[in-house]
Amino acid sequence: MADVTPSRTGQVSRKTNETAVSVALDVEGTGSSKIVTGVGFFDHMLDQLSRHSLIDMDIKAEGDLHVDDHHTVEDTGIAIGQALAKALGDRRGITRYASIDLAMDETMTRAAVDVSGRPFLVWNVAFTAPKIGTFDTELVREFFQALAQHAGITLHVQNIYGANNHHIAETCFKSVARVLRTATEIDPRQAGRVPSTKGTLA
């Protein structure tokens, strides 16, 4: 039988006076990634996002890292969100909703998503240190704010407990990856319909 899986890919190039970011992703991927942002910890987190969502990601970012990591992280979130929105199109046939409680050693983080076309972030995550290595922990929220806004998704992230800041950050990325994987999957019972009584997710 022929493969009838729809092509769901998105590409975005974004250039400002502060950054140049290119993103190509495939929602129907296997979680392979090629990521270079110049921010080592951020690259590690994006690899987790790709691997556990099964969304293939090719990301290249060049930013004003001599200032700090903020613009690079935020603009990468914007570009990933825009590419995801392009890949999902009118969101016809998707599962739409997903949630998970994700454990990593001593840490537990909850994520829930509605791939609704309505951007919103509820963030209930507190770090106990301002940095993980050289990476500002406040940038984790900035990334997900940019992603949610430009992907057009409602995203809730709550760290239930945890002691290690690396683990807290990593469970945020992994839990969001897992809910994106589920919510963006095609539900055959939807029969190609938009999963909304309004008939549109926009």
Curated annotation (Swiss-Prot):
Recorded GO CC terms: cytoplasm
Q: Which Pfam families match?
A: IGPD (PF00475)
Catalytic activities: D-erythro-1-(imidazol-4-yl)glycerol 3-phosphate = 3-(imidazol-4-yl)-2-oxopropyl phosphate + H2O
What CDD domains does the database record attribute to this sequence? IGPD (cd07914)
Kindly give the InterPro entries that the UniProt entry links to this protein. Answer: IGPD_sf, ImidazoleglycerolP_deHydtase, ImidazoleglycerP_deHydtase_CS, Ribosomal_Su5_D2-typ_SF
Spell out the molecular function terms from Gene Ontology.
imidazoleglycerol-phosphate dehydratase activity
Might you give the EC number(s) for this enzyme?
4.2.1.19
The protein here is known as Imidazoleglycerol-phosphate dehydratase
Q: Quote the gene name from the UniProt entry.
A: hisB
